[in-house]
């Protein structure tokens, strides 16, 4: 029998088929716009000698307190993923305050590279007898130098610090820890309350609650909702230890050459930055022109692209007077920012935030004019040197 004609054991209507999609084209659900339906906008394009080779689409939202002051790319419905760890930790912030040191508090909010210092900080949160409770996936370090670790461990996973802190917090709150990654665990309604509080919407309910890559629940939110939450994160930064912990130890939040760690260093205490999987970055900025807190959320349409997100972040922070260095240069390309990523009041300032450095010349072009040389050497008749064609 042709394999393509063989009935699948999980075809629609068969036992077990409910856990699979009904169609590879994708189903339509009320009030759930897919990435095909939304109005993504170009945010940055990479050009080789004036010609665009890659154009990175996405969405960006700016919020001042509870007000959206700028939106570009549509109010897309997405998942907050690991970008929401500062909010998740607010569920446990009070009970963990006196229990954790600053390194442990920082790693609790992290999506770390899995370096030695990351693993040590995460492991120190729990007693060794509790390590077996950890349910984050087995993984190898996200970034490795020198000796390569090839045997996966839960502690190497980028979310191990969060999982350890949640387990610690649940014990202190007297919550049963079995099944802690499930949305029916008693801590999850407390997390929903945190999101409602920071959105300023007591009636909010997520359209979807999905399983994140690390196994934890992640809620669907619009880009605008996320920006409002990040704005309020800044205005309420003194209510707990989260802002200070992430700024005290930025390299524990991400690690070497990670965007959120580098943003935290650039902000010198005026920024909280957190990356999320599949092209997310949340920024909470303390700025004199925005007294109710400024929240900026970037979402890359096609998913993870640290370099593109970095150029966008440099631009939006640059117009606010915060210097974020350029990422490491592209290979014989240049990045160019789309003006729509910033409110119109910052358009002029955007012109001065260059996407290259003095040691990063135009290596995407030759220093000679090819026309000058080809006109002198090319024959007008390409067959003139092939003889007279014979008798």
PLM feature segments, named:
Residues 63-67, 95, 222, 285-291:
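Short acidic-glycine loop/turn motifs at beta-strand connectors
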Residues 68-75, 100-110:
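Glycine-/proline-rich flexible loop or hinge segments
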Residues 49-52, 156, 270-274:
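Short Gly/Pro-enriched turn/cap motifs at secondary-structure boundaries
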Residues 2-7, 13-77:
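Beta-lactamase-like hydrolase cores
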Residues 2, 10-40, 102-216, 221, ...:
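Active-site-adjacent helix/loop patches that line small-molecule binding or acyl-intermediate pockets
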Residues 233-391:
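Structured C-terminal helix/loop/strand segments within mature extracytoplasmic catalytic/sensor domains
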Residues 80-97:
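Active-site SXXK
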